[in-house]
């Protein structure tokens, strides 16, 4: 099995959406659950290669995402973004290449189990 196929399988086994966005806010990867969430549930089409701000397109969201990304680059910590109407927490986590350079971030969802 190729490393890429293995990583794709790992990411697709995660039960919630995962989206990778590069330093220029371009969507580069979506796992199966992210594709379902954005394409089937929210009605977007062909987001790979497009700006993250095509689906997060209000000023408040844009500013929150940009501030979170700048904060992550400074302190390296994951950032809580919001709690969805489906009781899922959304986080952003910075991603570095093997040399330690920032290459973007992932947006990931998880079920909010706190009461």
Descriptions of predicted regions:
Residues 29, 33, 37-115:
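Sensory/regulatory domains in signal-transduction proteins
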Residues 1-30:
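Sensory modules in modular signal-transduction proteins
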